[in-house]
């Protein structure tokens, strides 16, 4: 059985639970419980603080972990990145009082910077030849300049609304982060086989994201032109219709190009276009 360490609460918790549910990993409960076993797949989920996850995986307390890249890089634990998951995206940035003009990184020389990520900050400052005084704070880093504890902060930024409410401005993006699936380097053969099945399910879910299944009626005399504008996985499915001169075309479209392609299809005479969501996609 595989043990997966995940964050006990917050945005990463919510998105991790959604991924497991979409991968048909059923959990009996996730509330006020440290360890929960799946009822239909050989995994159990261990709920931890996000900053404890890298160490738990590196030491073998857990076989896998779903953790923010920012925490993984900061902790420098000996675990491997298995998959980038593409959610819980954020950035680690330097921010300063918004009413002070920012001339560049040299401004931080001799300044006090509050952060929960001293390792990443120190490496960045050294690589840019900046000498600053780092104050390590856990939680509510954004209030440090306002109470005179620091001149600036280095912290996670998602929407930027927290900075605005504390009269701060983002001036340097140091790192971009997303959720990672990390693994212990010494998993047994049996656990790796379970991991392969888990990855198969996760890949099917992630591949289907931002994809739509499209069905349409197409005039046969325009079929070649219609197929030419479809960027499907290999080639679209074409089936005859009862009405002479018409056929049904089925394909998969990337949502980013959906309206662009639909417009071209309509111009070529496609009718009765039906669009459906895709839950999972196996290639």
From Swiss-Prot:
Description of how activity is regulated: Feedback inhibited by histidine.
UniProt keyword annotations, A-Z: Amino-acid biosynthesis, ATP-binding, Cytoplasm, Glycosyltransferase, Histidine biosynthesis, Magnesium, Metal-binding, Nucleotide-binding, Transferase
Cofactor: Mg(2+)
Reactions performed catalytically: 1-(5-phospho-beta-D-ribosyl)-ATP + diphosphate = 5-phospho-alpha-D-ribose 1-diphosphate + ATP
A single GO molecular function term of this UniProt record: magnesium ion binding
Keyword Transferase tagged: yes
CDD domains: PBP2_HisGL2
NCBIfam families: hisG, HisG_C-term
Protein family per UniProt: Belongs to the ATP phosphoribosyltransferase family. Long subfamily.
Protein name as it appears in the record: ATP phosphoribosyltransferase
Name of encoding gene: hisG
């Amino acid at each position: 059985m595989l043990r997966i360490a995940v964050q006990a609460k917050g945005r990463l918790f919510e998105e991790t639970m959604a991924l497991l549910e979409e991968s048909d990993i059923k959990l009996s409960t996730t509330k006020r419980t440290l360890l929960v076993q799946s009822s239909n797949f050989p995994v159990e989920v261990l709920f931890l603080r996000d900053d404890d996850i890298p160490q738990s995986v590196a030491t073998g307390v857990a076989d896998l972990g779903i953790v923010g890249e920012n925490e993984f890089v900061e902790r420098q634990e000996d675990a491997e990145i298995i998959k980038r998951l593409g959610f819980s995206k954020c950035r680690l940035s330097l921010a300063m009082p918004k009413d002070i003009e920012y001339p560049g990184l040299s401004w931080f020389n001799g300044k006090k910077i509050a952060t929960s990520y001293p390792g990443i900050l120190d490496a960045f400052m050294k690589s840019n030849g900046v000498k600053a005084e780092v104050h390590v704070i856990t939680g509510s880093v954004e209030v440090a300049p306002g109470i005179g504890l620091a001149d600036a902060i280095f912290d996670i930024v998602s929407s930027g609304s927290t900075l605005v409410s504390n009269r701060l401005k983002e001036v340097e993006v140091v790192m971009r982060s997303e959720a990672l699936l990390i693994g212990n380097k010494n998993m047994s053969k049996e656990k790796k086989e379970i991991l392969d099945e888990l990855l198969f399910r996760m890949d099917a879910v992630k591949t289907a994201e931002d994809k739509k299944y499209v069905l349409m009626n197409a005039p046969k005399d325009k079929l070649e032109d219609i197929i030419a504008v479809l960027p499907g996985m290999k080639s679209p499915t074409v089936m005859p219709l009862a009405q002479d001169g018409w056929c049904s075309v089925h394909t998969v479209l990337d949502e980013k190009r959906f309206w662009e392609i639909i417009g071209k299809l309509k111009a070529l005479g496609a009718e009765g276009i039906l669009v459906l969501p895709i839950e999972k996609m196996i290639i």
